[in-house]
Amino acid sequence: MEANGIENLTNPNQEREFIRRHHKHELVDNQCSSTLVKHINAPVHIVWSLVRRFDQPQKYKPFISRCVVKGNMEIGTVREVDVKSGLPATRSTERLELLDDNEHILSIRIVGGDHRLKNYSSIISLHPETIEGRIGTLVIESFVVDVPEGNTKDETCYFVEALIKCNLKSLADISERLAVQDTTESRV
């Protein structure tokens, strides 16, 4: 058991292996990249039911108010998302790069919008684990993005990491609530 109370089936070596295997990004000059990890007290199937919905990211991403999809959820499908006020953008155009229901991996690339996240791409992968004796999910999300003129790599990574951390916290809150409902309903 780790100091934070998480009994983890995915040891640090397994976590590194998941990152090595699923989170490959080719960086060029003037880009930054980072990988974030979140442990969620809900089974993979519940977390994946939210993450895989390329057509409904607003289900767990608090900064998205609306999403319109052009395509039929195949690789190359494009979505137009409206961003809530308070962020330095109003819309983003994103393309589905990978949707793997067996390995639980989703990858997107931003292809347009009125923001400064140029050449942004991200990969999110889910992995089963045990947390405090219960079935849980290890979520790994990585990204690469151009550093905008006038910003440093650290500033850019900090900004994107803050957005992803908010998304992952929301994903955890919603997934854990759904897991409790699922457990309660299965007892009835």
UniProtKB/Swiss-Prot annotation:
It is found in: Cytoplasm, Cytosol; Cytoplasm; Nucleus; Cell membrane. Phosphorylated by CARK1 especially in response to abscisic acid (ABA); this phosphorylation promotes its stability and inhibitory ability to ABI1. Ubiquitinated in DDA1- and CDD complex-dependent manner. Ubiquitination leads to its subsequent proteasomal degradation. GO terms for molecular function: abscisic acid binding; protein homodimerization activity; protein phosphatase inhibitor activity; signaling receptor activity. The modification Phosphothreonine is found at residue 77. Abscisate binds at residues 61, 89-94, 116-122, 141. InterPro entries: Plant_def-hormone_signal, Polyketide_cyclase/dehydratase, START-like_dom_sf. Transmembrane segments: none annotated. A motif (Gate loop) lies at residues 85-89. The record marks 88, 152 as: Involved in interactions with PP2Cs. Disulfide bonds join 32-157. Disruption phenotype: No visible phenotype under normal growth conditions, but mutant seedlings exhibit enhanced sensitivity of lateral root inhibition by abscisic acid (ABA), and reduced suppression of primary root growth by ABA. The record marks 62, 108, 160, 163 as: Involved in ABA binding. Keywords: Abscisic acid signaling pathway, Cell membrane, Cytoplasm, Disulfide bond, Membrane, Nucleus, Phosphoprotein, Protein phosphatase inhibitor, Receptor, Ubl conjugation. GO terms for cellular component: cytoplasm; cytosol; nucleus; plasma membrane. A motif (Latch loop) lies at residues 115-117. PANTHER family: ABSCISIC ACID RECEPTOR PYL8, OS08G0374000 PROTEIN-RELATED. Upon interaction with ABA, the 'latch' and 'gate' loops change in conformation leading to a tight dimerization and the creation a surface that enables the receptor to dock into and inhibit the PP2C active site. Receptor for abscisic acid (ABA) required for ABA-mediated responses such as stomatal closure and germination inhibition. Inhibits the activity of group-A protein phosphatases type 2C (PP2Cs) in an ABA-independent manner but more efficiently when activated by ABA. Confers enhanced sensitivity to ABA. Can be activated by both (-)-ABA and (+)-ABA. Mediates crosstalk between ABA and auxin signaling to regulate lateral root growth. Required for lateral root growth suppression by ABA. This is Abscisic acid receptor PYL8. It comes from Arabidopsis thaliana (Mouse-ear cress).
